[in-house]
Amino acid sequence: MSRVGKYPVSVPSGVTVQITGPEVTVKGKLGESKLTLRDNVEVTLDGNLIWVKPKNETKHARMMWGTTRAHLNNMVKGVSDGFTVNLEINGVGYRAAVEGKSLKLQLGYSHDIEYPIPDDVTMKCEKPTAISISGRDKRQVGQIAAEIRAFRGPEPYKGKGIKYETETILRKEGKKK
């Protein structure tokens, strides 16, 4: 079993952490994030370290111990540095563009796909075949990237579609005569 919860979360300078009852608020240069704690974990602030401890030794309390610590670590990293996911588009005629508060995708369908951009997430298209999604919430940035990728996932024969920048597509050989 992983013991992620044993290690403290270090708070960098420029980030403030406030614990009020069952809610932890983390503020930084990129904004503010809040986390409502479960009733079986206890969070304490000691200088610039956040410690998470289970209130009892039940299996559920130990599970939430590491999960809560990971969420707090992601919040601290998100408000100080932020998270970025890069997507690549491969295929003839496949392109993307940011128009106002929406992302316009041309992916070989008979219609263009409009994806609304949430307020706390920024999207950039330096090239028509590259999308950069960034924000302070790791879960939200990853979810948006997965939803955009799902519009046209990469196919194994020609590699056409939307893929993560670091993803490698397992290519298949075509049928033989």
From Swiss-Prot:
Gene Ontology CC entries for this record: cytosolic large ribosomal subunit
Molecular function terms from GO: rRNA binding; structural constituent of ribosome
Pfam families in UniProt: Ribosomal_L6
Cross-referenced Gene3D superfamilies: Ribosomal protein L6, alpha-beta domain
UniProt xrefs under InterPro entries: Ribosomal_uL6-like, Ribosomal_uL6-like_a/b-dom_sf, Ribosomal_uL6_a/b-dom, Ribosomal_uL6_bac-type, Ribosomal_uL6_CS
UniProt record, GO biological process: cytoplasmic translation
RNA-binding among keywords: yes
Keywords in alphabetical order: Ribonucleoprotein, Ribosomal protein, RNA-binding, rRNA-binding
Summary of the function given for this chain in its UniProt record: This protein binds to the 23S rRNA, and is important in its secondary structure. It is located near the subunit interface in the base of the L7/L12 stalk, and near the tRNA binding site of the peptidyltransferase center.
Similarity field: Belongs to the universal ribosomal protein uL6 family.
Stored HAMAP family: Ribosomal_uL6_B
Assembly and oligomerization: Part of the 50S ribosomal subunit.
NCBIfam families noted in UniProt: L6_bact
Protein name: Large ribosomal subunit protein uL6
Biological source species: Paramagnetospirillum magneticum (strain ATCC 700264 / AMB-1)
Native organism taxonomy: Bacteria, Pseudomonadati, Pseudomonadota, Alphaproteobacteria, Rhodospirillales
Gene: rplF
